[in-house]
């Protein structure tokens, strides 16, 4: 770790804190690379593509998951030296929470739009978050070296859709490095300096922006100082959890860790303070000095609530403890991921996990399988339902298998979302039909040039399964989708159980809307019929709601040719043998156990993907 003696604080007027707001793939992380390179944050040999995307998954999928930060030193054209703090944010809807934290630590944003593709749904969502945080915006059009780039049309589109002036947009190509100096100048010229109401003499007041786990240093906390000075050796107190810690190390990321003596107002840096778990550091908490606390805590963020739940089970039961340890480690870095133990008759011991959305679920599952070398089965994702019971109480339902007797429930409410979909108008018909099939309610439909912008209210239950994949396939990948949770509404929901040979299989039960139950049940039974191997007796597969069977398939029995040893001879002899076989099969059907192979579970749970 490099040592860097810096004068304790930089004047506020020479600090700029900014984040980059963009849709996936519009070149946000590449722009961050160029800014680091241009200001000399890393030597040429240390540069790698997407410096800030540390996780392998981030680089492979080309998405940013965790927000990262960098401090850049920049000498402007007017000869003054500035410190620029960049917080790179994720663009995907599931990580909107990471975005909101990063934005609250900055005063301005670069709005990056792909000059060939224009404004996308997530650009909108993140821009509105930035505007809500009173950010100044500098518009940057990226990828202008592409033959398909149309900067003038996109500028108009930005003004039309977002309603901000884009006439002075900076034109760049992050890949070739064209226009990067103009971006740096625009940051210094157009973005505001941070404000510090109390200045450095005031009691310490800092915002906890993020925390992550470092194997050598323990929990590292990213802070944005509002008032006062944070120095090494100080005893600090978290105002939300009331925990006290002694600061061991203060530093900044350039993206390398560099130790400094102190951080002053407006600066962003990290501290370590022998904190045991990331769960002890609440993002959005206010950090203050224990002896001289600040009077008023900062307005925090609301904690991220898990939206989608699913069970994760190890394929090999012996891996259960490893899975528990692995989840604990992931939880260190990702406070929005929650889990509790559960057991299933079909799949053994596992965990019920909560996620922010489907991408979050996929990424956690992939990280568990990759980084910890585990084989997992995920049950069908479900959302949180609110149940109003007949005795006047209210309960939450996370797992369809735990649903109480229907007689005791007076109403079930399910979560709804407000979705914004942007699509080229050629695909509009297909997308409208998709939303309608998913019980969507159209709120508005507007046109922006040749693209339609749809606003729909949809039940989250319908979106969780395979909505995003279907949307992408209908629109050949051109539509973009973003959503926010709105409220819970009453729904005609039923629990559909799958019975194999008369036994309910808990891992396959799901909540469905009554209108879709029959089709889902039939599909599931057909799928299981293909997947469960034949036994010596015939096996009925049924989908049932309560006591009513709504779909059924039968797997026929394998039979041994018992009459093979009779050459010619008496018909009654054959009859006797066949009757004896029939009685045996009947007995077998009563006591026989049906083995459902793991593959059948995995395939049945993926059923929505076709």
From Swiss-Prot:
Location relative to the cell: Cell inner membrane
EC number per UniProt: 3.6.5.n1
Main location: membrane
Topology versus the membrane: Peripheral membrane protein
Keywords: Cell inner membrane, Cell membrane, GTP-binding, Hydrolase, Membrane, Nucleotide-binding, Protein biosynthesis
Reactions accelerated catalytically: GTP + H2O = GDP + phosphate + H(+)
Enzyme class: hydrolase
HAMAP family assigned: LepA
Official protein name in the record: Elongation factor 4
């Amino acid at each position: 770790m490099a040592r860097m003696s810096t004068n304790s604080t930089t004047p506020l007027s020479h600090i700029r804190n900014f984040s980059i707001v963009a849709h996936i793939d519009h070149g946000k992380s590449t722009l961050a690379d160029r800014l680091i390179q241009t200001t000399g944050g890393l030597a040429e040999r240390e540069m790698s593509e997407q410096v800030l995307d540390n996780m392998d998954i981030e680089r492979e999928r080309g998405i940013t998951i965790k927000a990262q930060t960098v401090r850049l030193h920049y000498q402007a054209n007017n000869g003054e030296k500035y410190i620029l703090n960049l917080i790179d944010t994720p663009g995907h809807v599931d990580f909107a929470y990471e975005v909101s934290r990063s934005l609250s630590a900055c005063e301005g944003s670069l709005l990056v739009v792909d000059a060939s593709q224009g404004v996308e749904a997530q650009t909108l969502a993140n821009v509105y978050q930035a505007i809500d945080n009173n950010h100044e915006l500098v518009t940057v059009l990226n990828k202008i070296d592409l033959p398909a780039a149309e900067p003038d049309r996109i500028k108009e589109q930005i003004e039309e859709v977002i309603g901000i002036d884009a006439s002075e947009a900076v034109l760049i190509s992050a890949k070739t490095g064209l226009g990067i100096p103009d971006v740096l100048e625009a940051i210094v010229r157009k973005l505001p300096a941070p404000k510090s109401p109390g200045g450095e003499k005031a009691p310490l007041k800092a915002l906890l922006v993020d925390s992550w786990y470092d194997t050598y240093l323990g929990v590292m906390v990213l802070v944005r100082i509002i008032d006062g000075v944070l120095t090494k050796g100080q005893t600090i107190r978290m105002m939300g959890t009331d925990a006290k810690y002694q600061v061991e190390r203060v530093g900044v990321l350039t993206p390398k860790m560099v130790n400094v003596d102190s951080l002053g107002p407006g600066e962003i840096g990290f501290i370590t303070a022998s904190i045991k778990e990331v769960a002890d550091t609440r993002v959005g908490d206010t950090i203050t000095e224990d002896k001289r606390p600040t009077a008023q805590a900062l307005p925090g963020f609301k904690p991220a609530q898990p939206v989608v739940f699913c069970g994760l089970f190890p394929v090999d039961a012996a891996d259960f403890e490893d899975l528990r340890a692995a989840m604990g480690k992931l939880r260190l870095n990702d406070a929005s991921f929650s889990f509790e133990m559960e057991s299933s008759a079909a799949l053994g011991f596992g965990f019920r996990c909560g996620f922010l959305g489907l991408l979050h679920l996929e990424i956690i599952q992939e990280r568990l399988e990759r980084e910890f070398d585990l084989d997992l089965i995920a049950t069908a994702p479900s959302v949180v339902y609110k149940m109003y019971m007949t005795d006047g109480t209210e309960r939450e339902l996370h797992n369809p298998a735990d649903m109480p007797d229907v007689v005791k429930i007076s109403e079930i409410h399910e979560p709804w979302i407000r979705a914004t979909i942007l699509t080229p108008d050629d695909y509009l018909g297909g997308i409208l039909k998709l939303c309608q099939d998913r019980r969507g309610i159209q709120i508005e439909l507007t046109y922006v040039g040749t693209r339609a912008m749809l606003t729909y209210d949809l039940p989250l239950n319908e979106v969780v399964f395979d909505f995003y994949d279907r949307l992408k396939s209908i629109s050949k990948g051109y539509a973009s989708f973003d959503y926010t949770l709105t409220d819970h509404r009453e729904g005609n929901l039923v629990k559909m159980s799958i019975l194999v040979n008369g036994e309910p299989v808990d891992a396959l039960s799901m909540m469905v809307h009554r209108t879709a139950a029959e089709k889902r049940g039939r599909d599931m039974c057909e799928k299981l019929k293909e997947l469960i191997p034949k036994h010596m007796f015939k096996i009925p597969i049924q989908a049932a709601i309560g006591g009513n069977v709504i779909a059924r398939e039968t797997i026929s029995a394998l039979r041994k040719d018992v009459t093979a040893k009779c050459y010619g001879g008496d018909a009654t002899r054959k009859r006797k043998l066949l009757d004896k076989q029939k009685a045996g099969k009947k007995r077998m059907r009563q006591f026989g156990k049906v083995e459902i192979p793991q593959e059948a579970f995995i395939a049945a749970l993926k059923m929505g993907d076709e």
